């Protein structure tokens, strides 16, 4: 049987949604009102709204330079925009779907000559971002209930890495890795798969900090310090309509994180998972304790702000948006994998 870390998402998350339903009953809260925990964001940021709009809800000083490339923009104009952005901010740069999840469809552009080749892949609206070239990535979970802000969890994202043996190629070692999935083709194509790494040489494979894309997550909540909390609270508390979610951040090293010196690559909302629960050294019971505690916090934050005005679609429209967005994202991801 697979370790619970690798269970299908719907199976693993079922108890969370059942408990969240109980919390809604307890507070007499319509489930749709869970979005009101983050009433400043499109439906609380449940994965159907613009990541660019979410980013703009915060002070931009910690975020990468970002522009929006609309899907309907002609390819020739996209090429001009990308080159102008690269001239201003340098290469590499990142392109990622504006409505996306788990690292699907993300493209790293390190060479001007490859810009023309990626244009046919950009069928949905994309974010054009400066690449934050810092080696360590963390998820930092934030919650604010009854005026009390907290960092409820931290996880480090350990990027898939192979160790050379002087015999096998990068491609062979990657496909023998216990965390390997077909998604790895997203970044293996940017490496020389035929190269044979020297014995004990470490080769980092990925640039996407996603569990689905092969990252191992560890529970590093003990890294929280007053300095880190102050930096997180300064960013998040300034937006009263954001009370529950995870910041994905990059830092120079652990000491920098503890000092509150980080860059935010993405802010996530009510659909955020407390990813420190995925630590493979922990137990299933421990993971669910973390998960259900965050269900409680989400329901309490939403109940606190239940009277805030917020445009919420009918369930039918939400379901249609989710289905359409997932279909477009999966199609885009397959295009990127097949390029």
Positions of PLM-derived features:
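ATP-binding N-terminal substructure of ATP-dependent carboxylate-amine bond-forming enzymes
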Residues: 1-61, 70-80
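Active-site microenvironments that recognize anionic phosphate/pyrophosphate groups
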Residues: 24-27, 31, 35-47, 51, ...
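Active-site nucleotide/adenylate-binding loops and adjacent lid/helix of ATP-dependent enzymes
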Residues: 40, 50-185, 225-229
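Short hydrophobic beta-strand that contains or immediately precedes a catalytic carboxylate
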Residues: 94-95, 246, 264-266
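A short glycine-rich, hydrophobically flanked beta-strand micro-motif that places a catalytic Asp/Glu
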Residues: 130, 138-140, 242-256
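Coil-to-beta-strand transition motifs
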Residues: 135-137, 145-151, 241-244, 257-262, ...
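ATP-dependent carboxylate/phosphate-activation module, predominantly the ATP-grasp catalytic core
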Residues: 146-238, 268, 273-298
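C-terminal active-site "lid" helix and adjoining low-complexity regulatory extension at the edge
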Residues: 252-339
């Amino acid at each position: 049987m697979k370790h619970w870390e690798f269970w299908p998402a719907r199976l693993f998350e079922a108890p969370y949604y059942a408990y969240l339903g109980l919390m809604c009953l307890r507070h007499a809260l319509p489930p749709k009102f869970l979005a009101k925990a983050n009433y400043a964001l499109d439906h609380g940021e449940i994965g159907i709204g613009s990541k660019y709009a979410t980013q703009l809800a915060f002070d931009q000083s910690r975020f990468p330079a970002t522009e929006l490339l609309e899907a309907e923009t002609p390819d020739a104009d996209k090429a001009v925009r990308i080159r102008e952005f690269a001239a201003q901010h340098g290469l590499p740069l990142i392109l990622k779907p504006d409505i996306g999840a788990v690292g699907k469809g993300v493209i790293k552009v390190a060479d001007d000559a490859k810009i023309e080749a990626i244009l046919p892949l950009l069928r949905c609206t994309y974010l054009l971002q400066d690449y934050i070239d810092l080696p360590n990535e963390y998820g930092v979970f934030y919650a604010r209930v009854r005026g009390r802000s907290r960092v409820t969890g931290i996880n480090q994202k350990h990027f898939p890495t192979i160790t050379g043996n002087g015999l096998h190629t990068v491609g062979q070692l990657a496909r023998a890795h216990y965390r390997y999935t077909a998604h790895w083709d997203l970044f293996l194509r940017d490496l020389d798969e035929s190269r044979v790494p020297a014995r004990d040489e470490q080769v980092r494979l990925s640039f996407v900090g996603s569990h689905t894309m092969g990252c191992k997550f560890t529970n590093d909540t003990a890294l929280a310090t007053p300095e880190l909390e102050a930096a997180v609270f300064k960013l998040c508390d300034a937006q009263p309509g954001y009370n529950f979610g995870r910041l994905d951040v990059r830092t120079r090293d652990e000491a920098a994180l503890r000092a509150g010196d980080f860059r935010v690559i993405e802010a996530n909302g009510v659909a955020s998972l407390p990813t420190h629960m995925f630590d493979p050294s922990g137990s299933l019971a421990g993971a669910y304790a973390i998960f259900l505690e965050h269900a409680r916090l989400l329901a309490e934050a939403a109940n606190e702000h239940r009277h805030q005005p917020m445009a919420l679609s009918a369930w039918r429209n939400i379901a249609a948006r989710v289905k359409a967005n997932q279909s477009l994202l999966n199609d885009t991801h397959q295009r990127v994998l097949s390029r």
